[in-house]
Amino acid sequence: MSYNHSPKLDDSLSSLKEELIRNNQIKLDDYHRFDVKRGLRNSDGTGVMAGLSRICSVEGYYIDDGERVPKEGKLIYRGINMTDIVRNCQKENRFGYEEVVWLLLLGDLPTQEQLDRFRGVLAEARELPDEFIEDMIMKAPSPNIMNKVARSVLALYSYDNNPDDLSIENVLRQSIKLIAQIPTIMSYAYQVKRRAYDHKSMYIHQNDKSLSTAESILHTIRSDRKFTDEEAKILDLCMIIHADHGGGNNSTFTTRCITSTGTDTYSAIAAGIGSLKGPKHGGANIQVHNMIADLKKTVSDPTDEGQVADYLTKVIHKEAGDRTGLIYGMGHAVYTLSDPRAVLLKEFASQKADKYGFADDYKIISLVEELTPELFYKYKGEKKKMCANVDLYSGLIYDMLRIPPELFTPMFMAARISGWCAHRLEELCSGSRIMRPAYKSVALPRAFVPIAERNIDHIVPDYVPSEER
């Protein structure tokens, strides 16, 4: 596929870019002057309170006499500790993602009979409309799977006989179908990308209704359709821990924000996918993968503590890695002492990394987790609590499952769709206002200048407080 460039536009872009940048800079002092909650964060790093939810709670600290006090992290689904859900599934050696979907959507744990019936509903709903694969996925392939899934979700609007009905029953129907179909679309988009961009064989496998969601994903992304029960349950674990993370994370907030406008389900979920695609959000797991790959390529012994520390120091000083100064997979907006998702993934990786041939990678990542807090302290001089987040270990788990890097973020999406749909439904049930925050204009008033009197070197003035004008 090619894109037709415009020579005139290409020649003009450099000068246009310079003018755009010059006229769109806002001074940090102005943000402080108007007490702007940049990133919708308070001055202490906590999130601005934008709503209420019964779906999920993310806990990483408590407030004592106005001070933020770190504590071990907890992720709570509908009042139930997510770790307890995982432990029960491990104890009973069963799949749990479908149970979590029910819990997030409907608010309580299902009985065995309800769960069995719901699994059947999801399995049947995985099927895509007739000709959808050929018309919407195989045509106009994309090098980015998230982009392709977002386009496909928008296209499903045209296949729905009642796409704009916002009744709870209709949106629940749409939600269940999307929760079932998005993993299927993801798998097929990956196969088409393999053929169109990687010049490899493409395998379009039919869905097997007897399989769980995790099993179905492995069945459709692997050319031989083969996987072990252990592999499927590892992926199921990943899906449980990624299913939701409260209403304030960017993609869920995006979904709720767009839902508040009264738009359709497909538009709201496509917006959530677009948010999760960003490297500062769902794309962070691939950034960890790239950082570890660069570390292994850069140092002679990536399992040596001193060499890893030297590399990470260079990363912090923007002298290595992607030159952003970020050590991906470390730190979180809420979690302080621990991220329960990272704890579970690290536990599994420590037990199975050697079996799957990733013992060295596990050691490297463990060193990154161990060394980073002290290195940041030396650089910044402040003893801020910093823990590994879910992205540090999720890529390693996906590597162990032979899931290619281009599917890391889509795998996150395939699980998080359940949380997005739950929050959309809650917004429809409880929300009554369109979300409309304020932006303060810092453009000074000025007179219109006739075109004959305009000067190419004119500079738009910066903001000046009224008392200083």
Model-assigned labels for residue ranges:
Residues 2-469:
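Non-transmembrane, aqueous-exposed alpha-helical and coiled segments at domain scale
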